[in-house]
């Protein structure tokens, strides 16, 4: 596991490389449940398409990968909810200013990996990681692809709401929202689409019918295989269009 020095400590990170050993870079923002084997599996799948994937522990201020790892059985609704009570506050600790600073460090680290070929990069985020991905794309003109799946909190009334970053983005965007998600309602998705249109950005912005929040995570009770396959097929197409 790679270690990334930051202004506030050290973030551990997974690096997954393609069969060729080199390729365009993709920054992977984990969900609220931490940098665990499921995240490594997903990063490896993206890498198998021909990309170098960097997945940092974005909660490094709260502890190491081991410190913030899931406790209990996430595959039951009760276990998932119990760990959410532990993991949820960490999201609040990672405010917009900290996220912006971290993102710049992560993108610099990604580009400096010897396996990463010169050129545009992509970002992808899950759950609250989608917020980080949008912020990264809004601040870095060389981010050519940005995807977010079962995102939460992309559209708020706050001045630092992630969707306000879209005005300065250059990327193509892909969003696969969860269905019946209180953290990303149909009204939120509509407002996100309006912000994408106002910025003149190419985008796919969809609600995946019947897919719960967390649907990509096979180690949790929210797993929905059909929605995951749809999300990753769309992600594969996005990266192929924008990074090659």
Please tell me what each predicted stretch does.
Residues 1-244:
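N-terminal cap/leader regions of alpha/beta-hydrolase-fold enzymes
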């Amino acid at each position: 596991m790679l270690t990334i020095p930051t202004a506030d400590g050290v973030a551990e990170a997974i690096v997954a490389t393609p069969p060729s050993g080199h390729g365009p870079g993709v920054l992977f923002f984990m969900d609220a449940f931490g940098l665990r084997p499921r995240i490594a599996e997903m990063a490896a799948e993206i890498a198998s398409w021909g990309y170098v994937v960097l997945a940092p522990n974005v909660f490094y201020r709260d502890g190491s990968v081991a410190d913030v790892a899931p406790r209990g059985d996430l595959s039951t609704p009760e276990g998932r909810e119990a760990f959410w009570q532990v993991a949820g506050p960490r999201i609040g600790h990672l405010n917009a200013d900290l996220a912006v600073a971290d993102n710049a460090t992560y993108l610099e680290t990604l580009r400096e990996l010897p396996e990463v070929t010169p050129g545009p990069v992509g970002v992808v985020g899950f759950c609250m990681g989608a917020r980080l991905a949008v912020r990264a794309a809004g601040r870095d003109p060389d981010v050519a692809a940005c995807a977010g799946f079962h995102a939460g909190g992309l559209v708020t009334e706050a001045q630092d709401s992630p969707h306000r970053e879209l005005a300065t983005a250059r990327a193509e965007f892909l969003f696969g929202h969860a269905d019946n998600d209180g953290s990303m309602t149909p009204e939120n998705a509509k407002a996100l689409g309006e912000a994408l249109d106002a910025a003149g950005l190419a985008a796919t912005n969809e609600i995946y019918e019947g897919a719960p929040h967390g649907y990509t995570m096979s180690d949790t009770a929210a797993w929905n295989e059909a929605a995951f396959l749809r999300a990753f097929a769309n992600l594969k197409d996005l990266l192929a269009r924008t990074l090659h």
